[in-house]
Amino acid sequence: MASMRDIKRRKESIQSTGQITKAMKLVSTVKLQKAKSKAENAKPYFDHMYDTVLNMLRKSGNISHPYLSAGKSNKKAIIVITSNRGLAGGYNSNILKLVMSSDINKEDAVVYAVGRKGKEALARRGYHIAKDYSEVMNAPIYKDAIEIGKAVLDAFVADEVGEIYLAYTSFKNTVSHEPTLIKLLPVDMEAALQEGEKSEDLNERLTLMNYEPAAEEALNLIIPKYINSLIYGALVQALASENGARMQAMDSATNNAEDMISDLSLKYNRARQSSITQELTEIIAGANAIN
């Protein structure tokens, strides 16, 4: 059995750790609310961009445009959004598992890493890291999405990559986050039109939309903005998911610390009781020996 001194030291150590995890939980909660607010405020703009692209595709018929067909290259650009820090449960490992289990072969992947954890993990596994945007996840803004979007679009137009994908963690609510992989380019026209048919109010929302110049030229302007909006939406959702995951992890760690402290307190009291009993037994035995 551990001595009372050992138990006391371990209890104090766990109490100190519990205070840290509790503080980290509170910080993550505040950051989560800020990121969640960002995502909610930006959603109307992103929805409008999606509706605009969908409407253009519906009205254009069999339009031919580079953004609607795969490039000549077999390489596939993939924007992978993870965090710069750990202590977030399975947040980073889940998105990495999604990327590595996807149909994108390691040999064909050209990774645009957003987040240090993802960059380091994929580099160790032999993935080609084209660009590193880890600093973005400290406080993502729309300008960051424009920079990332321009980099992948330039590679697509130059036929350095034939397809562009985006891997991030979709924020559902405080406790639910879903690793997600979507194709950005080429735009899947058939899937987009099918999605449009499911939308009951789409026609009502888009009746006043007309395009000047022609649809082909308009796509040159709209698609980059559409891609940027998807990337920014993914950044803020990923940030909210990261802090939600960290909040849950720290809450679980704090609860575990409290359980361990309770268990150690019980062990300490038992050890103390045993020590007192032993001392009393020795005193009584000594008194009997004198008598």
Swiss-Prot record:
Subcellular location, record wording: Cell membrane
Membrane topology value: Peripheral membrane protein
Record flagged with keyword Hydrolase: no
InterPro entries: ATP_synth_F1_ATPase_gsu (IPR035968), ATP_synth_F1_gsu (IPR000131), ATP_synth_F1_gsu_CS (IPR023632)
Subcellular location, principal: membrane
Single GO MF annotation: proton-transporting ATP synthase activity, rotational mechanism
Organism superkingdom: Bacteria
CDD domains, per the entry: F1-ATPase_gamma
Gene Ontology cellular-component terms listed: plasma membrane; proton-transporting ATP synthase complex
GO biological process, alphabetically ordered: proton motive force-driven plasma membrane ATP synthesis
UniProt KW keywords: ATP synthesis, Cell membrane, CF(1), Hydrogen ion transport, Ion transport, Membrane, Transport
Quaternary structure (record): F-type ATPases have 2 components, CF(1) - the catalytic core - and CF(0) - the membrane proton channel. CF(1) has five subunits: alpha(3), beta(3), gamma(1), delta(1), epsilon(1). CF(0) has three main subunits: a, b and c.
Homology family: Belongs to the ATPase gamma chain family.
Summary of the function given for this chain in its UniProt record: Produces ATP from ADP in the presence of a proton gradient across the membrane. The gamma chain is believed to be important in regulating ATPase activity and the flow of protons through the CF(0) complex.
Protein name per Swiss-Prot or TrEMBL: ATP synthase gamma chain
Organism from which the protein derives: Lachnoclostridium phytofermentans (strain ATCC 700394 / DSM 18823 / ISDg)
Protein's gene: atpG
